[in-house]
Protein backbone atom coordinates (compact mmCIF):
# COMPACT_ATOMS: atom_id res chain seq x y z
CA UNK A 1 0.00 0.00 0.00
CA UNK A 2 1.66 3.23 -1.17
CA UNK A 3 -0.58 5.64 0.72
CA UNK A 4 -2.46 5.43 3.98
CA UNK A 5 -4.95 8.03 5.16
CA UNK A 6 -5.36 8.63 8.88
CA UNK A 7 -8.57 10.16 10.23
CA UNK A 8 -9.59 10.46 13.87
CA UNK A 9 -13.25 9.48 13.50
CA UNK A 10 -15.49 8.44 10.56
CA UNK A 11 -17.61 11.59 10.88
CA UNK A 12 -14.66 13.67 9.63
CA UNK A 13 -14.66 12.05 6.19
CA UNK A 14 -17.79 9.98 5.49
CA UNK A 15 -17.24 10.04 1.71
CA UNK A 16 -13.97 8.09 1.94
CA UNK A 17 -14.43 6.03 5.10
CA UNK A 18 -14.85 2.76 3.17
CA UNK A 19 -11.64 3.05 1.14
CA UNK A 20 -9.22 0.24 1.94
CA UNK A 21 -6.38 2.64 2.76
CA UNK A 22 -8.34 4.75 5.29
CA UNK A 23 -7.74 4.06 8.98
CA UNK A 24 -9.30 5.64 12.06
CA UNK A 25 -7.02 6.60 14.92
CA UNK A 26 -9.44 7.76 17.58
CA UNK A 27 -9.22 11.17 19.21
CA UNK A 28 -6.00 12.46 20.77
CA UNK A 29 -2.26 12.50 20.19
CA UNK A 30 -1.58 9.17 21.91
CA UNK A 31 -4.26 7.32 19.94
CA UNK A 32 -3.05 8.86 16.67
CA UNK A 33 0.60 8.04 17.42
CA UNK A 34 -0.14 4.46 18.46
CA UNK A 35 -2.26 3.76 15.38
CA UNK A 36 0.15 5.47 12.98
CA UNK A 37 3.13 3.54 14.38
CA UNK A 38 1.31 0.22 14.06
CA UNK A 39 0.23 0.99 10.46
CA UNK A 40 3.70 2.19 9.43
CA UNK A 41 5.25 -1.07 10.62
CA UNK A 42 2.53 -3.24 9.10
CA UNK A 43 2.01 -1.59 5.68
CA UNK A 44 5.29 0.33 5.17
CA UNK A 45 3.56 3.04 3.09
CA UNK A 46 5.42 5.60 0.98
CA UNK A 47 3.14 8.41 2.14
CA UNK A 48 0.90 9.06 5.13
CA UNK A 49 -1.95 11.54 4.84
CA UNK A 50 -3.55 12.99 7.96
CA UNK A 51 -7.03 14.21 7.14
CA UNK A 52 -9.48 15.76 9.52
CA UNK A 53 -11.14 18.71 11.13
CA UNK A 54 -9.15 21.58 12.61
CA UNK A 55 -10.24 24.73 14.35
CA UNK A 56 -9.22 28.12 13.05
CA UNK A 57 -7.04 30.37 15.19
CA UNK A 58 -5.89 32.96 12.65
CA UNK A 59 -7.53 31.53 9.52
CA UNK A 60 -11.06 31.31 8.17
CA UNK A 61 -12.72 27.97 7.29
CA UNK A 62 -11.16 26.23 4.30
CA UNK A 63 -8.71 23.53 3.23
CA UNK A 64 -5.11 23.99 4.36
CA UNK A 65 -1.84 22.14 3.96
CA UNK A 66 0.13 21.91 7.18
CA UNK A 67 3.78 22.94 7.00
CA UNK A 68 4.70 22.83 10.69
CA UNK A 69 3.30 21.49 13.95
CA UNK A 70 3.64 22.60 17.56
CA UNK A 71 2.31 21.10 20.81
CA UNK A 72 0.13 23.85 22.22
CA UNK A 73 -0.69 21.99 25.43
CA UNK A 74 2.99 21.75 26.37
CA UNK A 75 3.79 25.05 28.07
CA UNK A 76 5.99 25.43 31.13
CA UNK A 77 6.81 29.15 31.51
CA UNK A 78 7.79 28.61 35.18
CA UNK A 79 10.74 26.59 33.86
CA UNK A 80 11.58 29.25 31.28
CA UNK A 81 10.38 27.10 28.38
CA UNK A 82 8.50 28.36 25.36
CA UNK A 83 5.17 26.88 24.29
CA UNK A 84 5.72 23.52 22.61
CA UNK A 85 9.03 22.73 24.33
CA UNK A 86 9.15 19.65 26.53
CA UNK A 87 11.96 19.44 29.14
CA UNK A 88 14.84 17.16 28.04
CA UNK A 89 13.12 16.59 24.68
CA UNK A 90 15.33 16.53 21.58
CA UNK A 91 12.49 17.71 19.30
CA UNK A 92 12.34 21.40 18.42
CA UNK A 93 9.38 23.49 19.61
CA UNK A 94 8.09 23.66 16.04
CA UNK A 95 8.49 20.61 13.82
CA UNK A 96 8.74 21.64 10.16
CA UNK A 97 7.46 19.37 7.42
CA UNK A 98 8.21 19.34 3.68
CA UNK A 99 5.77 22.13 2.94
CA UNK A 100 5.32 25.87 3.29
CA UNK A 101 1.84 25.38 4.72
CA UNK A 102 0.21 26.69 7.86
CA UNK A 103 1.27 25.98 11.45
CA UNK A 104 -0.99 23.49 13.21
CA UNK A 105 -1.09 23.48 16.99
CA UNK A 106 -1.98 20.10 18.45
CA UNK A 107 -3.21 19.36 21.95
CA UNK A 108 -5.16 16.84 23.96
CA UNK A 109 -7.57 19.53 25.07
CA UNK A 110 -10.19 21.74 23.50
CA UNK A 111 -9.23 25.36 22.84
CA UNK A 112 -11.27 27.77 24.93
CA UNK A 113 -9.53 30.99 23.90
CA UNK A 114 -7.95 30.90 20.42
CA UNK A 115 -6.48 34.40 20.87
CA UNK A 116 -3.99 32.93 23.37
CA UNK A 117 -2.59 30.71 20.60
CA UNK A 118 -2.50 33.25 17.74
CA UNK A 119 1.25 33.87 18.03
CA UNK A 120 1.99 30.12 17.91
CA UNK A 121 -0.27 28.60 15.28
CA UNK A 122 -2.85 29.18 12.55
CA UNK A 123 -5.10 26.17 13.17
CA UNK A 124 -5.53 23.60 15.96
CA UNK A 125 -6.37 19.90 16.13
CA UNK A 126 -6.21 17.03 18.59
CA UNK A 127 -4.29 14.50 16.49
Annotate each language-model stretch with its function:
Residues 1-5:
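Extreme N-terminal starter segment of soluble prokaryotic enzymes
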Residues 8:
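Internal glycine-rich, Lys/Arg-flanked active-site/core loops of soluble domains
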Residues 11-126:
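Glycine-rich phosphate- or other oxyanion-binding loops that anchor nucleotides, phosphorylated ligands
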Amino acid sequence: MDDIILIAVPEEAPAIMLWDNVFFTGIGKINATYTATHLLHHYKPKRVWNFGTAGGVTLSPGFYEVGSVVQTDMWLPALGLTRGKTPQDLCPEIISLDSNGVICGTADEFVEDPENLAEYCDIVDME
